[in-house]
Amino acid sequence: MNLIEPTPAPSVALSFVIPLYNSADTIADLVRTIESLDVPGGHEIVLVNDGSRDTTREVCRGLLAQARVPMLVIEHARNFGEHNAVLTGWRHARGAHIVNLDDDGQNPPEEAVRLWRHAQERGLDVAFGHYLVKQHAAWRNWGSRMTTWMTDWALDKPKGFYLSSFRCVTAFVAREVAGNTGPFPYLDGLLLQVTQRIGSLEVKHRERQAGASGYTFRRLVRLWMSAFVNFSVMPLRLATVLGLFLAAAGFLALGVVSYWWWRGTGPAFGWGSLMAAFLVFSGVQLVILGLVGEYLGRMFITINQRPQAVIRERFRSDRPPSSEPPR
C-alpha cells in the first residue's frame, strides 16, 4: 500500500506517537498518564503496534474503547523496526507538534510537555530530550555513545550534539521526513537533512517499568549500519584512503626488501611472516568489499521496493479533540 497519504490540517496542538513492541505490561499506565495531561489546544495519542507477539493488540483495543482523548491504533503486519514504526505514526498524526515516546515508560509524559513548550518558545523544528542520567543497561549506553560518535563523523551534525529517541518535531518536519519510504530509515539522519533549527532540553529518564528492552545487540548493529551508510559516502572514501595508505606501505616495504637483497643483508624472512602479511592485506580487502557490498545490497533492496512498513489495520476513537485553542 502507499505509505504517503494527504496530511490534514493540524486539529490538535500535540500528538504523542508511541511505537509498541511487546508492550502489554507497560502501555496502559503510560496512556492513562498521557490522557490526564493538560495540553492547551488538545492532544491525541497514536499507538503503532509493530508486530508484537504478546497481547499488546488486545490491550490497545481496550484502551481505545475507554479513550478520554482522541486515539489512533495502527497495526503493522509484522515487525519492521522502531524507526519504521515512528514514521508510520508521524504520517497519521494530526498535531501541530509531535512527540514520540518509548513504550516502556522511561520517558515521563510530563517531560514531553516540557520538551514541546521548549520547542515552541525557541522556535525549534526539532527538540531532543537530553537525559541527565540514562537508566539503560551498560551495553546500551555504550552503544549510544558509539552511535553519537558515528553520527558526529558521518552526518552534518554539530560535534557532540546529543541525539535521542525522545524528540519533539513540528508537523512540517514530520511531513517532510515521512516522505521517505526507503526500507532502512534512520530518523536522526533524516531530520538533520531537513532542518537546522534543532535544540535540546535536559529531561529525566526513568527506570524501565516492566519487561525487557526490545533492542538486541543485532538490532543495535543494524541501526549503526543505517547511520553509517545511509547518509554519507564517507566510509567509501575512508576505504579509498586506507587502500592508498596500504599500497604506499607495500611499495615502501618492497623498496626496503630490494635494498636488503641488493646489499645481501637483512633478516631471513620465512613463510610465517609472508603469510601474516598476506592475511592482513586479505582481511583489509574483505572488509572493503563487505562495505561496498553493504551499499550495493541496500541499493538492490531499495530498488526492489522492499516496504518500509505494511499496515494491516487502523482503529480510531470517535472522541473529538479538545476545542480549547492553543496558547
Regions found by a protein language model. Name each.
Residues 98:
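Short aromatic/hydrophobic "clamp" motif used to bind/position activated sugar donors
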Residues 32-42:
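Short, acidic, metal-binding catalytic loop of nucleotide-sugar glycosyltransferases
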Residues 76-78, 82-92, 106-190, 206-225:
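Acceptor/aglycone-binding surface of glycosyltransferases and processive sugar-polymer synthases
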Residues 49-58, 105-106:
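A conserved acidic beta->alpha catalytic loop
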Residues 2-13, 186-327:
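Hydrophobic helical membrane-anchoring modules
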Residues 26-28, 54-63:
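Acidic helix N-cap motif at the loop->helix transition within catalytic regions
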Residues 41-51, 72-75:
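Short beta-strand/loop segment that forms part of the nucleotide-sugar
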Residues 13-15, 44:
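Cell-envelope/extracellular polymer assembly enzymes that use nucleotide-activated donors
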